[in-house]
Amino acid sequence: MNRTVQSYASAMFRVLKDDVYSPAVVQQQNTFAFGKTSSLCTDNHSANDQRERGENVRESSQNHVKRPMNAFIVWSRERRRKVALENPKLQNSEISKQLGYEWKRLTDAEKRPFFEEAQRLLAIHRDKYPGYKYRPRRKAKRPQKSLAADSSILCNQMDAETLHPFTYRDDCAKTTHSQMESQLSRSQSVIITNSLLQKEHHSSWTNLGHDRVTLASRISADFPFYQSLEPGLSCAYVQY
């Protein structure tokens, strides 16, 4: 009884060991490791891009100096708030159009306080930033999605070939072989179709030549009969 149990346990252990190291299980483990590595690589790239973009925006915001407000901006600050409160459904572009129209309708006397305030703010700005020159902001160019996708694909392929070179190359060879088989089958079908068309064309020309020979022999046989007819009636009998 003990020997039977031991032999059964050893057999089960061998089966489990063979299953663990079977090609299907190894391929499944390789696929899982490849997906995990590729996701980590993509996440690292996206995190680095976001970090660099955030640092660039922070540096540009710290170094950027705002322009001094002109008379229209000084006037429109308070007026924009009132218009937005009175008409909450209006969009910002519509409010800007309305403010521009109202500013044009103001008289010089009504605009004078705002010009004076703008001159005061300009003097303060010159004292604070003596060497200031207006430089408009440039929008940061985002990397193209296609380039990011290509880099991630290349990274995934490199990781796969580095981790499991034999499995990856075998899969590529199988894919190439299947593509060659499909192209060969297509070329064979094209050759067969062309040969059938040539045969049909040749048979049609053969039948046409046979009909011509038959017609000529028939006309030569009936030629004495046509000579015996009158000149006006011979054309009526030539038609078949």
Swiss-Prot record:
This protein's UniProt keywords: Activator, Calmodulin-binding, Cytoplasm, Differentiation, DNA-binding, Nucleus, Repressor, Sexual differentiation, Transcription, Transcription regulation
InterPro entries for this protein: HMG_box_dom (IPR009071), HMG_box_dom_sf (IPR036910), SRY (IPR017253), SRY-related_HMG-box_TF-like (IPR050140)
Main location: nucleus
Subcellular location: Nucleus speckle; Cytoplasm; Nucleus
Source organism, top-level taxon: Eukaryota
Gene3D superfamilies: High mobility group box domain
Any Pfam family the entry gives: HMG_box
Entry annotated with the keyword DNA-binding: yes
GO biological process: cell differentiation; male sex determination; sex differentiation
Basic and acidic residues composition bias: residue spans: 46-58
Region of interest (Disordered), ranges: 37-63
Keyword hit for DNA-binding: yes
GO MF assignments: calmodulin binding; DNA-binding transcription activator activity, RNA polymerase II-specific; RNA polymerase II cis-regulatory region sequence-specific DNA binding
A single Gene Ontology CC term: nuclear speck
DNA-binding region(s) from the entry: 65-133
Subunit structure: Interacts with CALM, EP300, HDAC3, KPNB1, ZNF208 isoform KRAB-O, PARP1, SLC9A3R2 and WT1. The interaction with EP300 modulates its DNA-binding activity. The interaction with KPNB1 is sensitive to dissociation by Ran in the GTP-bound form. Interaction with PARP1 impaired its DNA-binding activity.
Function per UniProt: Transcriptional regulator that controls a genetic switch in male development. It is necessary and sufficient for initiating male sex determination by directing the development of supporting cell precursors (pre-Sertoli cells) as Sertoli rather than granulosa cells. Involved in different aspects of gene regulation including promoter activation or repression. Binds to the DNA consensus sequence 5'-[AT]AACAA[AT]-3'. SRY HMG box recognizes DNA by partial intercalation in the minor groove and promotes DNA bending. Also involved in pre-mRNA splicing.
Family: Belongs to the SRY family.
Protein name as catalogued: Sex-determining region Y protein
Taxonomy of the source species: Eukaryota, Metazoa, Chordata, Craniata, Vertebrata
Name of the gene this protein is made from: SRY
